[in-house]
Amino acid sequence: MAARNCTKALRPLARQLATPAVQRRTFVAAASAVRASVAVKAVAAPARQQVRGVKTMDFAGHKEEVHERADWPAEKLLDYFKNDTLALIGYGSQGHGQGLNLRDNGLNVIVGVRKNGKSWEDAIQDGWVPGKNLFDVDEAISRGTIVMNLLSDAAQSETWPHIKPQITKGKTLYFSHGFSPVFKDLTKVEVPTDVDVILVAPKGSGRTVRSLFREGRGINSSFAVYQDVTGKAKEKAVALGVAVGSGYLYETTFEKEVYSDLYGERGCLMGGIHGMFLAQYEVLRERGHSPSEAFNETVEEATQSLYPLIGAHGMDWMFDACSTTARRGAIDWTPKFKDALKPVFNNLYDSVKNGDETKRSLEYNSQPDYRERYEAELDEIRNLEIWRAGKAVRSLRPENQK
């Protein structure tokens, strides 16, 4: 990028923007402060009727409702779920993040995984206690009033014939991805007709769900109702969204959640970005640039300097903060990239909506040698020159200097 001096000047600001405030009153502390008193009140008096606030915001001329964490302070959350046991099934990325956040918020949450498997051992390492709040899957479901199915998509499909009969009337079925119910023709996940079925989908990995919660910030999430038997499914979804660590939530449908999620992962979030990284890096190398220069101009400057600023201020601000040369070139080339890429993105959306991506995922991830094949793919990516160069570049960052 031509605006080298501008970029260097902006880097301290990017680091500042990426660092959470040191002095922050966290939701975790609030939950701890009221936990004991709420338990006493729950016995002494019936639950009070609470008014749940909703904020209407303008998103580029479109009015949308947003549900904020402030509408559900710790005392209200604990009171709302005082008669519930949240049975979290699966302890992968989302299970880990959401489960620990629920536990820290003081809710009665238990984990259900295969006994003595890797997830069982991982849960024990995180402080879950066998026989107290760690059980095998069947035992956890039998104890739970809200069953949070956070198994992988493939595992949800494989285990559903066994799990479905245990989702009995009066329970609530919770997902964090619309994959299984939406593509039921492929997954065979037909939900029972006599239970509430809801979704909370954090917009980030389970690690991010956990780290933002611990920083007192909270991740943004979508929520949806697939089936409302009790008339309280929407409120329950919002409350659970806050409980698992959301800072705010916006409403969607199961269909829109899964379409946008699969589309985004394959596009700008990972697949498309990786493809652009590779293409730009390879051209630079073919034109005689060194690995360090090619990586810095392709990945390092983007992730360490520009992307944090775009996230904080928007693309218009980024253009305005750059040199006239960088600005002119970026603006001129934007429509060329858009025109070249839009047909690819339309094909991708079609592939998501018609179920091709779901079929591919289920078939691949259900193979007995899935793990070995995946590790081989990952090893190939790890050994690409771009990422081997990146490892060396990252070692030079000040925070990595010993």
Swiss-Prot record:
Binding site for NADP(+): 90-99, 114-119, 152-156
Molecular-function GO term, any one: metal ion binding
InterPro entries per UniProt: 6-PGluconate_DH-like_C_sf (IPR008927), 6PGD_dom2 (IPR013328), KARI (IPR013023), KARI_C (IPR000506), KARI_N (IPR013116), KetolA_reductoisomerase_fun (IPR016207), NAD(P)-bd_dom_sf (IPR036291)
Cofactor(s) demanded: Mg(2+)
Domain named KARI N-terminal Rossmann: residues: 63-252
Residues at which Mg(2+) 2 binds: D261, E297, E301
Top-level EC class as recorded in UniProt: oxidoreductase
Keywords: Amino-acid biosynthesis, Branched-chain amino acid biosynthesis, Magnesium, Metal-binding, Mitochondrion, NADP, Oxidoreductase, Transit peptide
Subcellular location: Mitochondrion
Binding site for Mg(2+) 1: D261, E265
PANTHER family: KETOL-ACID REDUCTOISOMERASE, MITOCHONDRIAL
NCBIfam families found in the cross-reference section: ilvC
Protein family membership: Belongs to the ketol-acid reductoisomerase family.
Protein name: Ketol-acid reductoisomerase, mitochondrial
Gene: ilv-2
